[in-house]
UniProtKB/Swiss-Prot annotation:
Signal peptide: none annotated. F-type ATPases have 2 components, CF(1) - the catalytic core - and CF(0) - the membrane proton channel. CF(1) has five subunits: alpha(3), beta(3), gamma(1), delta(1), epsilon(1). CF(0) has three main subunits: a, b and c. One of its GO terms (cellular component) is mitochondrion. Belongs to the ATPase epsilon chain family. Its main location: mitochondrion. This is ATP synthase subunit delta, mitochondrial. Residues 1-28 form a transit peptide. Pfam families: ATP-synt_DE_N, ATPD_C_fung. GO terms for molecular function: proton-transporting ATP synthase activity, rotational mechanism.
Length: 167
């Protein structure tokens, strides 16, 4: 793949018939049609939480660190780690969701798309139950069964993020 991209960079245009042009390709001189506000779409495999809703800000737990996304944010794709997504609507009301991971894509048109396997309102969690589960799975990490220990390590990682978010 890299050889193809390097070849394309050296050539002034694509060789005839080598690559079919993708949909929506644009040149540097063409402007992108932008929304006036940040527009959020957030979906799970079984439910859409937001569908093209104008918002003020979205805070995400990216693998590279916590990020606040506002209107006119640079286009990017981020892998999300377990943590809290905070959505600030136009009335400055905040909604917080705990996610187990996922992806966020910021388009040049001010559209932010978030896809996650699981998302739950933060207020639906019990801090005491989360702490109890964390202690239980920390103990399971010392299991002699590698499978049990590996599953416990994943659960501990997610539960530690949840316990931090609930404080």
């Amino acid at each position: 793949m890299f050889r193809l991209s390097n070849y394309m960079l050296r050539k002034s245009q694509f060789p005839q018939g080598l690559v079919r042009a993708p949909f929506g390709i644009r040149g540097y001189a063409q402007a992108v049609q932008k929304n006036e506000k940040l527009v959020l779409s957030m979906a799970l495999p079984y439910q859409t939480i937001y569908e093209k809703v104008p918002v003020t800000q979205v805070d995400i737990p990216a693998e590279d660190g916590e990020m606040g996304i506002l209107k006119d944010h640079v286009p990017m794709i981020q892998c999300l780690k377990p943590g809290v997504i905070s959505v600030t609507d136009e009335s400055s009301n905040k909604s917080k969701y705990f996610i187990s991971g996922g992806f966020a894509v910021q388009q040049p048109s001010n559209e932010l798309s978030i896809t996650v396997p699981e998302a739950y309102k933060l207020e639906d969690f019990s801090s005491s139950v989360a702490n109890q589960l964390l202690e239980k799975h920390k103990a399971e990490m010392n299991s002699s069964d590698e499978g049990v220990a590996a599953e416990a390590a994943v659960r501990v990682s997610v539960l530690e993020s949840l316990v931090r978010a609930l404080k």
